[in-house]
């Protein structure tokens, strides 16, 4: 499972260029090219992109596998404080309500919403959900519902900037969330090349399993990939052992196949 940063297809710091038809019109062709170039790969990966739907613009994560769009997840919590002003350009997924949506993207009918779980047919414990950056930092993150619904892993596409002490807090947040939810947590933030306007990014990568940080890169390092393994069978055992871990129904499960 490869997790890429938030809005990586266009860049996070585009500002009011997100209102540009030229920029938004280039998103789908770029995504179609990614689908074409990765059709022979077995890796599942997430791509951050802006997406228009129902007359509104959403900050989204597209889940891609073997040339197929498995689903698109819009961001729920949009920061609008300090150096962040996402509500200026984007709408929250909360405006979708509890309705079930599909959209047409790159010639495919694609599930759209925050109610999506992605499950491997050959590996029943390999089920994951997706949230985006600020979704993790709120009191009731979407990952709570996703893991209760069966997700063993959460992928977080992020563009979290650097200020004094923030990396330590981010590390603690990812570790604590993976412990509380008995899950694997993959966190991928934007790289230094995104450092424009009034924010600095360090390419902070974190991978945690049930409270333990398994892998982390050095901030501002040149290495672009942080790789490790998550023991999903151990996570499932922990959930079975902890009988207070209640299941949550009502999520859509998108099944994919691995060779």
Regions found by a protein language model. Give the residues of each.
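Enzyme catalytic cores with a strong preference for nitrogen-chemistry domains
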Residues: 1-259
